[in-house]
Structures are given as structure tokens and as C-alpha cells.
Amino acid sequence: MAGHSKWANIQHRKGKQDKLRSKLFSKLAKEITVAAKMGDPDPEKNPRLRLAVKEAKSNSMPKDVIDRAIKKSQGGDAENYDEIRYEGYGPNGIAIIVEAMTDNRNRTASNVRSYFTKYGGDLGQTGSVSFMFDRKGEILYKPDAGDADTVMMAAIEAGAEDVESDEDGHWIYTADTDLAEVSTALEASLGESEHAKLIWKPQAPTEIDLETATKLMKLIDALEEDDDVQNVTGNFDIPEEVAAQL
């Protein structure tokens, strides 16, 4: 999400992490099950599954829950999920991408459309806003992984495309197809990362004011609380002084 560190701080201030934690494990487990079902159930032989397990561990998901999710993929009773992307505009024309995983397309489409309508947005067609984003891999390291120069050199050597460092951490960006490979290479030089995942990176984030941010948060909250929704991304940036008031 644009304004990554500020976004995390806003979620923390709002107590949103606690509110979503009950749903978080089920969303992570769903991704693990789907990744394992589509490929090899061994994370070492399945890059998508390896990243899903890594994300689950970084969110303190118990090992037995992770193992159960993998095992579920191999059973005959595992649900079939469709991966769908919805695109539209939020308040003040902010572009929004919603990634969902569902066993009922009609239910999910209806729910997502209703959230956009209720909170001042407009759901569009696939492709209506994704051209404003780049599909990238994002790897996050804490500030103590090293200074900006050290992390930059390690990232370049590992094959990354870009690095953004500030007091909250180091965000390393890769081509979407290189994420697993770069993540593995960085572990050898910088140790375990906080997360490594595919994202939609806004090409030109729009800085928003308090009124727009407040409206936008209502839409994003509603979307993220839906069981079928895995990720929500927008092309906005929230200034520090606005973030402090949310």
C-alpha cells in the first residue's frame, strides 16, 4: 500500500490489527491451502507456498495451523477457490484493487459492489485501474537489518530492482517473477525478512486530505473485513499530519 509505514501505523492506532486478527489466520490458511493444491505441498519445491508459509509465520500463525492448511490441500474435501481481481474507484477517484479468493463468485461480486456503492466508490471492469499499478515483489526488513547503503548493496546483488529505506524499515522491490529467488538470496546476506509478498505498487500515488482519508478508510475496512477478500491496494499516500488524525 502506498505510504507503507504510515499505513501500518494507522492500522495500529485504529486497533485494526486486533479487529482483523481473527480473520487474518483464515485468510493466510486459505492462501496456503490454495498454493499447496496448485503446486507441490513441499514449500521448498513450491515458491508460492514458501512465501505463503513465510507470511503466516511472520504473523505468528502456529505451526500446527500451517501444517493443517497444507494437509487440507491434499484431501479430497478441499474447497475449490477462484482467484478474482476487482477494480474500481474509491472516494475522490482513488484507484482501488481488490484481490479475492472465493468459492462463490456471485456472493463475492455482490458484496464487493455493495461496499463500493455504500462508501462513495464505483466498481469498474477488470483493467479499469490496474494500468496505474505495477505488479511487484515486496520484501520488508526492519531498520536493524543494516544501514541504507548495506541493504541497498545486498538488494542489488540479490537481483532486486529498487529499495526504499526510512526510520521504519527497508522496502525492497523486485520483478514479480523474481520475488522468491531474491527473497532467498537476501536471507543469506541479511537474514529473515519481515515479509516477502506480491503487491500492486502505485505508479503515481495521490496525496489525500483528512476528509478523503476518513471516507477511504471506511471502504477499505469494509473490504478487508470480508472473508473472501485477501488484499486491498490503493494509489494513495497519506501525509504524516493527516495520518496522525486518523
UniProtKB/Swiss-Prot annotation:
Coiled-coil residues: none
InterPro entries noted in UniProt: Integrase-like_N (IPR017856), TACO1_YebC-like_2nd/3rd_dom (IPR048300), TACO1_YebC_N (IPR049083), Transcrip_reg_TACO1-like (IPR002876), Transcrip_reg_TACO1-like_dom3 (IPR026564), YebC-like (IPR029072)
Ranges where the record places region Disordered: 1-21
Predominant location: cytoplasm
Pfam hit, one: Transcrip_reg
Protein's GO biological process: regulation of DNA-templated transcription
Cellular localisation: Cytoplasm
Gene Ontology MF annotations: DNA binding
Keywords, sorted A to Z: Cytoplasm, DNA-binding, Transcription, Transcription regulation
One Gene Ontology cellular component annotation held by this UniProt entry: cytosol
Family listed: Belongs to the TACO1 family.
Entry protein name: Probable transcriptional regulatory protein Pden_1905
